[in-house]
Amino acid sequence: MEQQTNNPLHGKRIEQILKELVAYYGWEHLGHKIQIGCFRNNPSIGSSLTFLRRTNWAKSEVEALYIEMYRKEQAVKNTN
């Protein structure tokens, strides 16, 4: 199997990605960054996962935001 050391999504499930984004941004800020109803109205991991698994464009936006967050965290680690 090919190693993907530079891919922050490799080996991550959408549930883990979502939980990390919620921990980093919080639901309110996440709802502003990605304007999806399940992030803004009574947000929960369960309802968000159901929506993301059925809606490819939304899942792509969540993955892109995760990569952005990951790169910011790596930049901070590299400056310290």
Task: Place the predicted regions along the sequence by residue.
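Long, compositionally biased intrinsically disordered regulatory segments in eukaryotic proteins
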Residues: 1-80
